[in-house]
Amino acid sequence: MTARTFDIRETRDKDLLRELLASDPVAAAYLLGDLVEPFFRQCRWLVASAGGARRLEGAVLVYTGLSVPAVLSFGAPDAVEAVLAYFARELPEMCYAKFPLEHADAFPKFFQLDYMERLWVMGLAAENLQRPTQLREALQLSKSTPIEPIIALYTDYPGNYFEPSQLESGAYFGAYAEGQLVAIAGTHVLAPAEGVAVLGNIVTKSAARQHGYATACTARLVEALAAQGCSTIALQVAADNAAAISCYRRLGFRFQEVVWQTRATRL
C-alpha cells in the first residue's frame, strides 16, 4: 500500500479541530475539553490533513498548562506518526503521554517510555444513565464543604489530583456513612460548551467498598453534568480494576477503547 502524504501544520482553528474530534467524542473527550478557555491558550495543536483536503486526519495536542507538559493524540495512526515526525524537535523533552492502542507503534519512535499503564476508556450518553432503583444518598459538594475529610480520603489514593478550587464547579459529589465521608466522585474535564465531561477522582474508603457509595456519587454526578449540558460522559479506568469497571457498567458505561498512559522522554 502506498504511504499517504500529509499537509502538516499547527492550527488554532477550533472548527477544524472540533470536526475531527467529534468523530468519536468519548475517545476525544480530553481533547475536546481543551478547546475551551483557559485551557485552549495553553495548547499547541499539531495536525495533519491528507491529499490537499482541509479536513484533518490526525492531531497531537501538547498541553503546557502543567509543570510537566502532557501530550495526547487522536486520529489516523499514519497521520499521527507523520505529525510526530514533523515536529520531533519541538516535542517536550519530558512529558506525560496518553495515546490510544493504535498509536503504540508511533510514540516509541520519538519518545523513551518509562512505563506503560493500560487504561480502559468508557463512555455514556448521559440520557442513557441506568440509575439503580435502590440508590444511596450522595450530596453535591461545594466550596463551603469542609476540605479536610476530602483531602484525607484522597490521601489513600495518591494517583488522584485534587485542588479545593475544583469544588467550585459543582461537579463533585460525596457519600457519607455515620457522618464520615466515605466516597467521592468528581471530574477531570468539564466542558458544557463542547457537550463533554470526563469523570475522575472517584474513590471509596477501603472499609466502605462494595456498599454502593461510589455508584451513588457517580450516578448523581452524571445527572448534574447532564443538567449543565454535558451529553457525552467519559472516564478512564485501569484495565485491571474489575470492581470499578463493573460499577460503571451497571450505570450504563460501555467500553470504547484502550489507551496507554506513560511518562515519556524525547529521543
Predicted regions located by residue number:
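Short amphipathic alpha-helix that is part of the acyltransferase structural core
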Residues: 1-29, 120, 125-160
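Conserved donor-binding loop and adjoining core beta-sheet/short helix segment
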Residues: 2-8, 19-21, 25, 29-87, ...
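Active-site rim helix/loop that mediates acceptor-substrate recognition in acyltransferases
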Residues: 25-44, 152-178, 182
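Acyl-donor-binding surface of acyltransferase catalytic domains
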Residues: 51-52, 63-135
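A conserved beta-strand-loop-helix scaffold within acyl/acetyltransferase catalytic domains
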Residues: 63-64, 161-171, 176-203
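Conserved acetyl-CoA-binding loop-helix of GNAT-fold acetyltransferases
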Residues: 77-87, 204, 210-227, 232, ...
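Conserved beta-strand-loop-alpha-helix junction that forms the acyl-donor binding cleft
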Residues: 98-104, 235-245, 261-267
